[in-house]
Amino acid sequence: MRVHRLPENFSLERARRAQLAIARMVLEEDSLPESVRRAAGVDVAFKGDYAFAAAVVVEYPSFSVVDYSVTRTEVRFPYVPTLLAFREVWPAYTALKRLKSEPDVLLVDGNGRLHPFKAGFACHLGVLVDKPTIGVAKKLLVGEVGSWKSGVAPVLYRGEVLGMAVKTSERSKPVFVSIGHKISLNTAVWIVRMFTKRGLRLPEPLRLAHLYATAYARGNMEEKDFYLDEPS
């Protein structure tokens, strides 16, 4: 396994400028159909030199899987905190473009606005595909959790509410929900709750995307279901 190094033309200044540009492009208003029925969960797993991205479309209220894809791409960017979008957005995009059905909204494993530069993975992917997108993180990246009310608490960073901590069940740890693109924070929380099965922590599309991506990375799914998609 080779060590993944930063691209030769990389500069932190350019990366930050790109993040700020993405942050300016994010829309924080709802752009959804009247009836939201299909959500795609997006997650990326890594093993060796490859990224395994899964996109799983789940239909509400049955929670049935109506479409999914998993792609394998070569890792082109190392792990750099606050720059995860540069590592994950291409694999995620390749999985999304394989889908045959059109989801109403994307649920992404990672942060959106809840990011030091207001431009996490969910923002990058949402702007790239121009779809309503929600960031759902399992750990708090930045900010402080405020007072809880009805299982929800604001997450403040530098005096601004950038996300919401959401307890999807009484016994589970919270998830941290933030705007990715073309959605309001209140609607994002509502959709996360809507697509979460009773007693579980993660919304079903995202829970399944994590399982699918991990299974492919470990070689636990059939070869005939595997899509190989390398950048040209």
Swiss-Prot record:
Subcellular location(s) of the protein: Cytoplasm
What PANTHER family would the database entry show?
ENDONUCLEASE V
Q: Which Pfam families match?
A: Endonuclease_5
| Record-listed Mg(2+) binding positions | 43, 109
Molecular function via GO: deoxyribonuclease V activity; magnesium ion binding; RNA endonuclease activity, producing 5'-phosphomonoesters; single-stranded RNA binding
Any single GO CC term annotated in Swiss-Prot or TrEMBL for this entry: cytoplasm
Q: Might you give the EC number(s) for this enzyme? A: 3.1.21.7
For the protein in the UniProt heading, the enzyme class is hydrolase
User: Required cofactors, per record?
Assistant: Mg(2+)
Q: What does this protein do?
A: DNA repair enzyme involved in the repair of deaminated bases. Selectively cleaves double-stranded DNA at the second phosphodiester bond 3' to a deoxyinosine leaving behind the intact lesion on the nicked DNA.
Q: Which UniProt keywords apply?
A: Cytoplasm, DNA damage, DNA repair, Endonuclease, Hydrolase, Magnesium, Metal-binding, Nuclease
GO biological process terms, alphabetically, are:
DNA repair
Question: Is Protease found in the keyword set?
Answer: no
What reactions does this protein catalyze? Endonucleolytic cleavage at apurinic or apyrimidinic sites to products with a 5'-phosphate
Name this polypeptide is given: Endonuclease V
Q: Which gene encodes it?
A: nfi
List the residue(s) that the UniProt entry marks as the site Interaction with target DNA: 79
What family is reported? Belongs to the endonuclease V family.
